[in-house]
Amino acid sequence: LMDVPFYLAQPEYAGVTDIQVAAATRKSDEQIVAIAPQAQAVVNKAVRLAKLQSTPNADKQVAVMFWNYPPGEKNLSASFLNVPRSLRHVLDGMQAAGYDTTTPQEDALIEQLQHLLAPAYRAGRLQPLLQANLAELLPLADYRAWLTQLPEATQAALNAAWGDPAQSRMVVRRGGQDFFVIPRLQLGKVLILPQPPRSDGQVSKEKAIYHSTTALPSHYYFATYLWTRQRADALIHFGTHGTQEWLPGKERGLSVYDPPLLALGDIPVAYPYIADNIGEATQAKRRGRATIISHQTPPFAPGGLHAALTHMHDLLHQWLAQDEGAVKERTAIDLLAAAQKERVVADLGLTVPQVQADFAGFVRQLHDHLHELAQTAQPQGLHTFGQAPEELHRLGTVLLMLGQPFWDAAAIHAGVPPEDADEALVGPWEQLAQTAPYQLLQRHVVQGEPVDDLPEALQKSLQQARTAYANLGAQGELTGLLAVLDGKYLPTSYGGDPIKNPDAYPTGRNLYGFDPSRVPTQQAWEAGKQAAENLIAEHIQLHGKAPEKLTFSLWSVETMRHFGLLEAQALWLLGVEPVWDAGGRVTGVRLVPREQLGRPRVDVVLSATGLYRDHFPNVMKQLAQAALLASQARDEADNPVARNAQRIAQQLIAQGADPEVAAQAGATRIFASASGNYGTGLDDAVLASDTWSGKEEGDRKLAQLYLSKMQYAYGPDEKQWGQAGVAGLEGRQGVNLYAEHLKGTQGAVLSRSSNLYGMLTTDDPFQYLGGIALAVRHLDGKAPALYISNLRGAGSGRVEGAAQFLAKELATRQFHPGYIQGLMQEGYAGTLQVLD
């Protein structure tokens, strides 16, 4: 577990792909010996890569697998990628590189790919696909022959879950033989097919949602991949992201008989992946044998203000400029009415009486709020793989990369008084191209005017802008994909949010993750300490006293962006600090004395995603040790960590637990899903309202589902990691230790460090932050306060209420005409983005 930095992170940094366990040390004589099936898998992959290198492009067969997401019989998409247009661009590029393929028109391509999805939703659609040459047959005998080569335990598990393969609804009978039907669109030697659903529709919804812990994919899932391996020389998993790398099995160092590798076999996998999701891209590397080809996020622009907010901003400035009197009073009435109409008063967490009691204070808050909305990075539509954004959006992205110092300097250079420079981008969203910062970029970046006569700071910014603008060209994406299809090495790069980390571009490179041994970095530690104090202050302001217990949701994708700032918050709340070696690697933690801390410790429960568990076991070890140290500081009268640890230990001893086991359980603070499993189960369960009757039963079943899925403990003793319950208290009276530790949670914290992914972009914030809130309400009868550690901008990060954060997201996206029009221009793919 602790060797992830050495065996995985460092080789991935160098560009090594498909790292497999091929040998082991024999206990009897300490000799390194090959593990035959594993070593064979490495050899087979090397042979297939060599074949890609030697086969002319015109002779290569390539399969492209797309995702049926969001669920629905007409839906195909990927995260912030226009899939139909991207497929067409890739097909054009493959043709130009000598591949035997054609490129249908966009509407025809969408219609044909939608036909391929129909059998997953409706009976009687297999024969029409076969008649239209939109499917092929895989003899069931071929699948059985493959199945019989697997270990007996694997065969038994598959048959126990799904019965005999012949029972699959994707099987047809012809000429006395059974065949799996594989929907596919054949364009020359390129095959495009949907990734098969994990389920075959034979398991009851109640069992699948509430009781399944392993969720083995169906016979049909494996059959589709078997057919793909037989037909194709390489496989493209198209966009972020599919299901194969999330199948059950070990976190890393998988066996070839674990479901993720069982599906893939040894076929080379190219995986175009969004640059701002390094964590899940790493999952595709380690569990999907993939070479990642990074692609851009959508371009961005400062959101600006829509008409109602522009009017509000104008009223605000009128009020500030007016002398006391009737006109100013009338303006104040109009401004408050406008703010109420747009629900901005509520968004600021205020009431009308509070506004009236301190109108000048309200104006200051409103002014800051409108500036933040106008300057917020707003995604502009979707990205098309291999295509550069249009000039307006490209320059808008560069503007955001350069940030407030450039905006102010550009405005002052254009003659704006310094006291008004911060208004440079605060105006109607349609007029971005008329602003001074944008026009300066256009002249010196696009038109190439010299910068020699400009102030030195502007010269430096514009040189950076020229590089950033060039890097937004996206030329490397198609080049990178074609290189992988040639079996070639692909240069590496770090990814992340391009606004915060412009070095994530140019794209078309093989993404690697952050070295987990450096979490938190010393910079993240200093920022995290301040963020922790900000969190305490925010809670005091809202609730009148400091929190005693908080629960944090830890995400791999977030940690790879903020380098451990959220972990630093948790450590400082506990009153523990990291110890680094000379190279910046964390080697341990130590307790901060109470007098040095200057306040009581805060008890912290840590709920980790499955991906975090996989990628950061060494960080979990340090966090577990930190919780233990804080729980052992029993001489502090105001230490809730020690108090809660002792309370839980005593409860467990009273129920019959061994005192040492009880003490370990009391000191445990980290929980996640079972090893090899991912998610909370809430994403599917909330849509299955037909499995409960009434809100009370629904809340109870959802909370119990969440607690059962996320109860696996990662405490001070690594040997006991990943276990549910408490040793000695198994059976009917088994203890859910996670539930015991969640009781009394006063606040739950999630970080947001991406300018692209917000609270509503995916269901993950709902699953994890919402799951904590749901569980605590179930346990305590009262939901905790929900906080967002907003790490999008520079500095230590702000702590905001989730409601306020969500309100700003709605104002700059779902309720903003610029965002809506951007998606409308994407056609079919934009509609799916709204649906998602």
Where are these regions (language model features)?
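Ligand/cofactor-recognition surfaces for anionic moieties
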Residues: 1-836
